[in-house]
Amino acid sequence: PNHRIEKSSELSFVEYLKRNTLKSKKALVFFIIFASFCFSAMTQMSFSMKDLSSEMMGVMMLVIGLVLAFTTLFLAITTVINGNTKTIAMMRVFGYSQKECCRAILGGYRLLSYIGFIIGTVYQYGLLRLMVDIVFKDVAGVPTYKFDFTTMLISLACFITIYEIMMYIYSEKIKKISIKEIMIE
């Protein structure tokens, strides 16, 4: 019974730290959502461009979206890790596992990244419908735009895969944080 109480208080500390990390780093929360938004909107929109514009326009949108998304995500997650190195080191001193450290520091961003993906999906759909139905309604030869579930699912699968690989890489970075180095500072 005592072990369950300890485990419960341990989990509540990790959950508290996760929430506190999100609350104290509101700008980083925005950038995580923004990176996911960019990935979602630009990848899905780029595949629609071959029907609405040209393949070259689609490729340009895809490259711009991916560069923007990866750069933003890389900078945001690096900032989160670097800003919490002492916290991570202290958690490791107190016996928390790498998984618990990752859950406390990075875990709160997962749901937010998925929310960003959903917002990006809705945005690209709304923007393309606006363009096709209102802006170019009088232009001859503009095809009707329909939401492409297949592209959305492919984009979502790619996003989840890439995001989880990045989180794994950063969890390995957390594992390499030297307690001794932090204590000397």
Model-assigned labels for residue ranges:
Residues 4, 25-26, 105-122:
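Selective transmembrane-helix segments that form parts of the transport pathway or gating/packing helices
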Residues 44-56, 117-157, 168-181:
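Short helix-loop junctions at transmembrane helix boundaries
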Residues 71-110:
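Interfacial "coupling" helices/loops that link adjacent transmembrane helices in transporter permeases
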Residues 19-34, 149:
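Membrane-interface helix starts
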Residues 1-5, 14-19, 23, 76, ...:
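C-terminal membrane-exit region of the final transmembrane helix in multipass inner-membrane proteins
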Residues 23-30, 41-67, 79-82, 90, ...:
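Peri-transmembrane interface segments
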Residues 31-42, 59-75, 112-120, 155, ...:
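Alpha-helical transmembrane segments of integral membrane proteins
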Residues 5-16, 59-64, 94-112:
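Hydrophobic alpha-helical transmembrane segments
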